Amino acid sequence: MAKATLKTIAEYTGLSVTTVSRALKDGDDVKQPTKEIVKAAAKKLGYRPNPSGVGLRTGINYNICAILPVTKPGDIVGDVGSLALIEGFTAALKGTPYHLTVLPMAPDEDPMEPVRYAFENNLCGGMIFNLTKTQDERVAYLHDNEIPFVTFGQTEMSIEHPYVDIDNHDMAYRAARQLYEQGRKNIRLLSSSHDYTYAWHKYYGARRAAREFGYDFEIEKNIIFDSDVDDYRKLGNKLMSGEQAPDGLICGSEISACGLLAGIQDTGKTIGDDIDVVLVETCDLPSFFMPPISGYRQDFHQVGRKLIQHLLRRINGEPVKHLQTLQKTVYYQR
C-alpha cells in the first residue's frame, strides 16, 4: 500500500491540499468540523508527516537516537531486555512527530563513538543511552554540546542530568536478605562489569543485607563479574565443585541463570537443597526453568516509555530535577 500523503487525504475528503495541510496544523482559518474530518481521514489512511520535512519547516530535529549494546559474535542468545526497551520507546513516541533511530554499540567499541557520530552528523534532536559509569564521558560531552539526553542508569558526576534507573541497591538488598533469611550464609552475586554504576549499587545493597545478618560481603570473595565469565555452565560447575561452594546465588539475568543452573545440576547438586538461587529478570522466562526460579522483575517496557517521556519533556525545557526516576523491581515467587 502506497504511503499516504497530503494529496491522498485531499482526494479522500474532497478538500484542497492547502486546506488539508492547514487542518492538520490546527490552523485558525479552518473550521473545527473540517479539522475533525481531515484528522479522521489521516488516521484511517495511516498518514504520518515526513520528519525531515517537518524539521526543515520548524528547525527542529524530530529524530530520537537510542544507542544500545549488541551481542558479540558467538553469543547464543541476545539481550532479552532490549526488545522490551524498544517497544517502550515506540509506544511513548506514538502520536508525536518524533521518530526513533537505534544505533548499535559493539561490545569492543568505545562508548563515545556512536554518541560522537550521532552528534557530528546531526542525526537526532535528543539521545538515550545506557550502561552508565560513575564518571561518564558521554554525559559531559552531550552536556557541553547542549544536546538533550536521558540515561538509563545513574552517574556520580557533578552534572545533573535526566535519568531513569532500576533501584539496584534495593533489589540486591532484598535478594540477599531473602537468601540469608532462608539460612544461606555463603552467597555469590553475579554482577555486570565494575565499570558500571549499577554494579556498585548492587554490591552495596547485598553488603548491607550481609552486615544486618552478621556476615561479611567482599568484592573479591562474594562477587563474580560477568566480564570475567566465558561460559556460565562451566562457571556453575566450577563453583559447586570447589571446597567453598556457595549455598546462595544471585544471578544478574535470565541468560546467566540458565547456564549456571545447568552447571550446578551437572555436579549432581540440587537447587533448593544444596543451593538457593534468585535472579534479576525482565520477562517470565524463569518460570520455565527446571526448577522454576524466583526473580526480581525489571519492567523494561515501562523504563522505555519513561525514558522517552523524560527526553521529550527535557527537549521542551523542563528542569532536570523533575526528570530523574528510580524504579523498584517487583518480586515474582516461583
Feature annotation, model-predicted:
Residues 1-62:
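N-terminal helix-turn-helix DNA-binding module of bacterial transcription factors
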Residues 4, 29, 33, 51, ...:
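Residues at secondary-structure transition points
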Residues 12, 44, 88-96, 143-151, ...:
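Bacterial carbohydrate/catabolite-sensing allosteric modules
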Residues 16, 62, 125, 185-186, ...:
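Short acidic/polar active-site loop segments enriched in Thr and Asp
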Residues 45-113:
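Amphipathic helical "hinge" segments at domain boundaries
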Residues 106-109, 130-135, 255:
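Short beta->alpha connector loops
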Residues 112, 135-139, 257-260:
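Short, well-ordered alpha-helical microsegments
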Residues 113-125, 206:
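Short, electropositive alpha-helical surface patch
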